[in-house]
């Protein structure tokens, strides 16, 4: 039987604080801690103090994430959280809490109810099907529209009109 009220016998390292943000000297490949997969409405978030994943919320509508999502260790955005990463064109589900190497292809400027909450756009660095993608623009016009639509409407049932995509950089 487990001793539920006993302190842990060892400390689990917090990946947010020990992993480097970049895996290479060219600063194009990032470590990304996976928080969720595409086609889910559940929003998981890393607890910054411990590095554990927590169900932050269940989506307010059936509008599911159109990409896998995670964060970059040792980074902090203006909203006080690690920098967010959209991992696009993932064909197989990733394991929540796992570390993947991703190649940066752009940034989406995002205003979430008055807070800056920009999103790094990336592809899995080892996915040979993505070798031809060097910029978010290579994903096509429909991808841009879908991503913009998702971010500008995912909170509509809770706080309509509070989220704005302010462009893409690449």
Task: Describe each PLM feature range.
Residues 1-170:
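Hydrophobic N-terminal alpha-helices or hydrophobic patches in metabolic proteins across all domains
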